[in-house]
Amino acid sequence: MILVTYDVNTVEPGGRRRLRQVAKACQDYGQRVQNSVFEVEVDPARWVALKARLEAIIDPALDSLRYYDLGANWQRRVDHVGAKPAVDLHGPLIL
């Protein structure tokens, strides 16, 4: 599990577009757990692709990305309190 966090400057021109693009890229690979925070479970190849996609979107002079590798036993390292219940990505999907 990788925790992806980002801060995109929306004051400068193009900032809102970059913010939407970063959020969309993260949603394509994981689930939003807070504003600007995503949990992502990917294999190494998909992780390289996501990182490249995100880093191509942001303006490094104005925006930032942070990645936290929580490892394979991430469930034991994450405590959740409050609203927005966690979604079990490995549980059954009911449509």
Curated annotation (Swiss-Prot):
The keyword Cell membrane does not apply. Its EC number is 3.1.-.-. Mg(2+) binds at D7. It is an enzyme of class 3 (hydrolase). The keyword Metal-binding applies. GO terms for molecular function: metal ion binding; RNA endonuclease activity. Its cofactor is Mg(2+). InterPro entries: CRISPR_associated_Cas2 (IPR021127), Virulence_VapD/CRISPR_Cas2 (IPR019199). Keywords: Antiviral defense, Endonuclease, Hydrolase, Magnesium, Metal-binding, Nuclease. One of its GO terms (biological process) is maintenance of CRISPR repeat elements. Belongs to the CRISPR-associated endoribonuclease Cas2 protein family. Homodimer, forms a heterotetramer with a Cas1 homodimer. NCBIfam families: cas2 (TIGR01573). CRISPR (clustered regularly interspaced short palindromic repeat), is an adaptive immune system that provides protection against mobile genetic elements (viruses, transposable elements and conjugative plasmids). CRISPR clusters contain sequences complementary to antecedent mobile elements and target invading nucleic acids. CRISPR clusters are transcribed and processed into CRISPR RNA (crRNA). Functions as a ssRNA-specific endoribonuclease. Involved in the integration of spacer DNA into the CRISPR cassette. This is CRISPR-associated endoribonuclease Cas2 3. The gene is cas2-3.
